[in-house]
Curated annotation (Swiss-Prot):
PANTHER family: HOMOSERINE KINASE (PTHR20861:SF1), HOMOSERINE/4-DIPHOSPHOCYTIDYL-2-C-METHYL-D-ERYTHRITOL KINASE (PTHR20861). Pathway: Amino-acid biosynthesis; L-threonine biosynthesis; L-threonine from L-aspartate: step 4/5. Its EC number is 2.7.1.39. Catalyzes the ATP-dependent phosphorylation of L-homoserine to L-homoserine phosphate. It comes from Clostridium novyi (strain NT). NCBIfam families: thrB. HAMAP family: Homoser_kinase. Belongs to the GHMP kinase family. Homoserine kinase subfamily. ATP binds at P85, M86, S87, R88, G89, L90, G91, S92, S93, A94, T95. It catalyses: L-homoserine + ATP = O-phospho-L-homoserine + ADP + H(+). This is Homoserine kinase.
Length: 299
């Protein structure tokens, strides 16, 4: 039996649209067992709503085996732990893709190199900002050079924590991309480029007091924010309670506030405020994950 543990991720992180991502200590775990014949996919909760042919764990796992002409009898696949919610902007699809590839590669005797795993995962996901940190951990900046994925790790300050706010409604990537404009002004592009560059340096230097300025954005958040109820009030309260910066996680609907680990009152104060809103919000106070995806059982 093989068990793969994959962290959820937050992507974009303000100005880093489709490029920046960070792994968080919230996880999905996938268990794979060999059986005599056929495929069994144990699907529970939100996953049970997805047809097998559209299940990213199943399709990625099977396609990876077939691509390498691996001969097999059958497998039972189970999403044995599902803490990363679907379609909420925390990289749920990346956990499924990465988990499927890692499980298949382990079964095949680790025939794929690290770079091959990353390239395959990005080709399925379509963009690198979630899958790269899910694989390597930490904060990453990723770019595409034709079919090649180039990434670099960014140092995350020890004091940084992510207060994650997950509403009880989904926001699909397709819908969230659909509200974005087809073009941007030069001023808007320069605004984001300068802040994205500054954000990397601020992270590397541990200058968390500068995060608010660096995480401003004019490319996607003002458009997607219209799809998330009470976002302005939530961000205003987070600022009032001492947040370092607030942003939409991925394409939404999850919101994140970066806080200093010593801000001991933030969790309770923010949760109490969210409880007054009409939607139900699940909250987590998370550290960055620095290990990325890993095989935690192989026997």
């Amino acid at each position: 039996m093989i068990k793969v543990k994959v962290p959820g991720t937050t992507a974009n992180m303000g100005p880093g649209f489709d490029s920046f991502g960070m792994a968080l200590d919230i996880y999905n775990e996938i268990t794979v067992e060999e059986i005599e014949s056929g495929f069994e996919m144990l699907q529970e909760g939100e996953l049970s709503e997805i047809p097998l042919a559209e299940n990213l764990i199943y399709t990625t796992f099977l396609n990876t085996l077939n691509k390498h002409n691996y001969k097999y009898k059958g497998f039972r696949i189970n999403l044995s732990k599902c803490d990363v919610p679907m379609s909420r902007g925390l990289g749920s699809s990346a956990t499924c893709i990465v988990g499927g590839i890692f499980a298949a590669n382990s079964i095949m005797g680790n025939v794929m190199s690290f770079d091959e795993i990353i390239k395959e995962a990005v080709s399925i996901e379509g963009h690198p900002d979630n899958v790269v940190p899910a694989i390597v951990g930490g904060m990453t900046v990723s770019i595409m050079d034709k079919d090649n994925v180039i990434y670099s790790n960014v140092t995350v300050p020890d004091r940084l924590r992510a207060f994650v706010m997950i509403p009880n409604y989904k926001l699909g990537t397709e819908e969230a991309r659909g509200v974005l404009p087809d073009s941007y002004t030069r001023e808007e592009c320069v605004f984001n480029i300068s802040r994205a560059a500054m954000l990397v340096n601020v992270m590397n230097n541990g200058e968390i007091e500068k995060l608010r300025l660096c995480m401003q954005d004019k490319i996607h958040q003002k458009y997607r924010g219209a799809l998330i109820r009470n976002i302005d009030d939530i961000f205003k309260k987070a600022y009032e309670f001492g947040s370092l910066a607030e942003f939409i996680s991925g394409s939404g609907s999850t919101l994140i506030a970066f806080i200093d680990k010593d801000n001991n009152e933030f969790y309770d104060r923010m949760k109490n405020f969210l409880d007054t809103l009409e939607d139900e919000w699940t909250v987590h106070l998370l550290k960055p994950n620095f290990t990325g995806a890993e095989i935690i059982k192989n026997r």
